[in-house]
Amino acid sequence: MQIIVPASSANLGPGFDSIGVALSLLLTVDVLGPATSWQVDHQLADLPHDESNLIVQTARQLVPDLTPHHLAVQSDIPVAHGLGSSSSAIVAGIELANQLGALHLSNEQKVAFACQLEGHPDNVAPTILGGLVIGTEVNGGFAAVKAPLPPYLFAAYIPAYNVKTKEARAALPTTLPFKEAVAASATANTLVAALFTGDYQLVGQLIEQDRFHEQARAHLVPELTQLRELGHRCGALATYLSGAGPTVMTLLKEADFPAFQAAITQAGLPGRLVPLTPHPTGVTVS
C-alpha cells in the first residue's frame, strides 16, 4: 500500500490560519508489511525512525493498538519551510490508521481530527481535500469549503535556512487594535469573494494587503520585499509569505516563470525557485 500526501501553502496573504492550497511537492509512505516494532525508513535529517515519528504517533492516536508496520518514507517537502511538512505527516498518519484500522473515515472526519492536532485548518484541509480550501472552527468543529483554483503557477522561493513554526508564532502580536482588526478581516473576506468570482486582478491586490502576520515576520524572511518587487517587474499576480515562512510564494503565469527565475539569479538571491502547481485531489491511497 502506498499513501501519497501533497504539500500545502497557507494563508495566501490575509487568509491567516484559514486559507490554504495543496501543492505538487509530495510525501510518499510505502507500507511494506507488519513488523515486531514500528520501523520508519527515510533520509530526512533529525526525524525519528521509530514509533515516535509523527506519522506513527498520529496513527496511534486514532488506533492505539495498531499493529506495528515497516514504512518507507520519501518526501520532496522541505521541513520547517512553510510548506506544511508536519501537516502532510499528520495526514499520512491519519490515512495510515484509516487503512490499517479499517476505520472508513469520511473526509470531514479526517479534517476534523487533523484540525484537532494542528489547531487550524489552513494546511491540513487542502492536504486532505486537495485544491484551494477555506476553513475555520465552528461550534467546536471545523468547516472547510473548497474554492476555485487560480489559473496560475505557484513559484516557491525556498531559502536554505528554515524558520521554526514556534519562532514564527512568537513574532506575532498578541493583540490588534480594533480598527486594524476590522480592516484585516475585511481584506480577507474580500479576497475570498474575489476568489469565488474569479476576479484575479483584485485577488492579486488583496493577497499583498495582509495585516495579520507578514509585517511581524518580515525580519525572519528578509527576501520577501525584494521578491515581491521582482515579481511585479515580471508580471506576477502576487507574492506572499507561505505559512510561517521562510518560503515565499509568487503566483504568475507559466510563461513568465523564466523571466522571474532570471531576475532572481541576477539579483543574487541564493534560494531555490521551484515551479509548483495546485494538487487537485489531496491525499491518495493505492
Swiss-Prot record:
<protein>
    <recommendedName>
        <fullName>Homoserine kinase</fullName>
        <ecNumber>2.7.1.39</ecNumber>
    </recommendedName>
</protein>
<comment type="pathway">
    <text>Amino-acid biosynthesis; L-threonine biosynthesis; L-threonine from L-aspartate: step 4/5.</text>
</comment>
<keyword id="KW-0808">Transferase</keyword>
<dbReference type="GO" id="GO:0005524">
    <property type="term" value="F:ATP binding"/>
</dbReference>
<keyword id="KW-0028">Amino-acid biosynthesis</keyword>
<dbReference type="InterPro" id="IPR036554">
    <property type="entry name" value="GHMP_kinase_C_sf"/>
</dbReference>
<dbReference type="GO" id="GO:0004413">
    <property type="term" value="F:homoserine kinase activity"/>
</dbReference>
<keyword id="KW-0067">ATP-binding</keyword>
<dbReference type="InterPro" id="IPR014721">
    <property type="entry name" value="Ribsml_uS5_D2-typ_fold_subgr"/>
</dbReference>
<dbReference type="InterPro" id="IPR013750">
    <property type="entry name" value="GHMP_kinase_C_dom"/>
</dbReference>
<keyword id="KW-0418">Kinase</keyword>
<dbReference type="InterPro" id="IPR020568">
    <property type="entry name" value="Ribosomal_Su5_D2-typ_SF"/>
</dbReference>
<dbReference type="GO" id="GO:0005737">
    <property type="term" value="C:cytoplasm"/>
</dbReference>
<dbReference type="InterPro" id="IPR000870">
    <property type="entry name" value="Homoserine_kinase"/>
</dbReference>
<dbReference type="Pfam" id="PF00288">
    <property type="entry name" value="GHMP_kinases_N"/>
</dbReference>
<comment type="similarity">
    <text>Belongs to the GHMP kinase family. Homoserine kinase subfamily.</text>
</comment>
<comment type="function">
    <text>Catalyzes the ATP-dependent phosphorylation of L-homoserine to L-homoserine phosphate.</text>
</comment>
<keyword id="KW-0963">Cytoplasm</keyword>
<dbReference type="InterPro" id="IPR006203">
    <property type="entry name" value="GHMP_knse_ATP-bd_CS"/>
</dbReference>
<feature type="binding site">
    <location>
        <begin position="78"/>
        <end position="88"/>
    </location>
    <ligand>
        <name>ATP</name>
    </ligand>
</feature>
<keyword id="KW-0791">Threonine biosynthesis</keyword>
<keyword id="KW-0547">Nucleotide-binding</keyword>
<dbReference type="GO" id="GO:0009088">
    <property type="term" value="P:threonine biosynthetic process"/>
</dbReference>
<dbReference type="Pfam" id="PF08544">
    <property type="entry name" value="GHMP_kinases_C"/>
</dbReference>
<dbReference type="InterPro" id="IPR006204">
    <property type="entry name" value="GHMP_kinase_N_dom"/>
</dbReference>
